[in-house]
Structure formats: structure tokens, C-alpha cells
A protein has these predicted regions:
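Short gly/Ser/Thr-rich phosphate-binding loop of adenylate-forming enzymes
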Residues: 1-18, 52, 61
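Short, well-ordered alpha-helical microsegments
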Residues: 5-6, 30, 141
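Specific aromatic-rich, kink-prone transmembrane helix
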Residues: 33
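AMP-dependent adenylate-forming
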Residues: 18-21, 36-201
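Conserved lysine of the Walker
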Residues: 27
Length: 201
């Protein structure tokens, strides 16, 4: 599955009696979190864990991060598989003993980046393999895309690092405009500057 884009949620909400966003990889038996979508303002959260499921947001050293901080999304609980059939290396990489003190069992590293929002819901921000280092800063390309997707003038966005001249890497975002107008790069940069650090704009 893919993330539920804000513009699709906006289009669906008036047409359905209830809109639910469910998140979960096959390795955790399909769904792990759920959220009833009430509005399409901002990014669409993936919600809270379902029963018998635990969610952990971990840093690069497998420490839990506080709310608001981006980390790797890991899932534990009764629905978590024990590993991959005949793939011991991949199993060892993705299925680990729970590193949180007092918590037992296996957890699954999803490969997704996420953070816990102020209201306690989870926000998925893309893949960990979508993370780059540019000019000494670690940049989450998925977070840039998420912020662009929240703008009314943007239907869809993709952020990349492009190197036109050897050694001159830069952030580039490609967008599909929403509606008939096309937002200027100045307007987009100004909007991103309100929510992202300078090195990500």
C-alpha cells in the first residue's frame, strides 16, 4: 500500500460516511495502526496501534525517541512474524529483539520513518532509504515531500538530490500543481521555510 495523500482524502471525505487510514506491512499481519480521518488538513496520520500491537520510534542506536522526533518505525506484538522463510540475513536485519528496557519479544524494522504527533497519533514520513546527507546535514526527503503535499497548490511532490555539476549536489523538488495555477518556486520555498529548517529548503 501507499500513503493516503491529503488531496485524495479531501476528495473522498464528502463522498463516504467514514474514511479510515490503515497502515501495516505484511510482516506484521497486514494492519498495525488505524485512524479515522476527520479532515484533510495537513498530512494524514496513520493513527494509533491496534490491539495487541506496539509501535516504537527508534533512533539509529535503537533508543526510543521522544514525541515529535523522527525515527525508524518498528512494530511488535502478537501479529509480528518471526522472520522470513529461508532468508536468515534479511531476518537478522529486520527482526530484532526489542531493545526497549522491560519490553520483550521480537520487533520488526519497517524501513519507514515516522514521528509521534502532539495528539499521540503517528505520522509516516517516507522510507529510511529515502534519507540523504547533504552538506553535513541529514535530510529526510520524505518530510520535504510531506510538507509540499500539504500545500493547497500542490497535488503531488517528489524530492531528490540532483548533481548537475560534479560536487555540486542540491535539493530539487518536482511537483504536480493542484488546480489550474502553478505555484512559483519562491512561494514554495517560503511555505517550506515555515515548517522546515533552512538546510531542507
Amino acid at each position: 500500500g501507499e500513503a493516503l495523500p491529503r488531496n485524495l482524502a479531501e476528495e473522498l471525505l464528502p463522498r463516504v460516511s467514514a474514511l479510515w487510514n490503515m497502515y501495516g506491512p505484511t510482516e506484521t499481519t497486514i494492519w498495525s495502526t488505524i485512524e479515522r480521518v476527520e479532515s484533510a488538513t495537513g498530512s494524514v496520520p496513520i493513527g494509533r496501534p491496534i490491539d495487541n500491537t506496539q509501535i516504537y520510534i527508534l533512533d539509529a542506536y535503537d533508543n526510543a525517541v521522544p514525541a515529535g522526533v523522527i525515527g525508524g518505525l518498528c512494530i511488535g506484538g502478537r501479529g509480528t512474524a518471526l522472520g522470513y522463510l529461508n532468508r536468515p540475513e534479511l531476518t537478522a536485519e529486520r527482526f530484532i529483539e526489542n531493545p526497549i528496557p522491560g519490553c520483550d519479544g521480537i520487533i520488526y524494522r519497517t524501513g519507514d520513518l515516522a514521528r509521534i504527533r502532539r495528539d499521540g497519533t503517528l505520522e509516516c514520513l517516507g522510507r529510511t532509504d529515502h534519507q540523504v546527507k547533504l552538506r553535513g546535514f541529514r535530510i529526510e526527503l520524505g518530510e520535504i515531500e510531506t510538507q509540499l503535499d500539504q500545500l493547497d497548490t500542490v497535488a503531488q511532490a517528489v524530492a531528490i538530490v540532483r548533481e548537475d555539476v560534479a560536487g555540486d549536489a542540491r535539493l530539487v523538488a518536482y511537483i504536480v500543481p493542484a488546480g489550474t495555477g502553478e505555484p512559483s518556486s519562491v512561494d514554495l520555498q517560503a511555505a517550506l521555510g515555515e515548517t522546515l529548517p533552512d538546510y531542507m529548503v
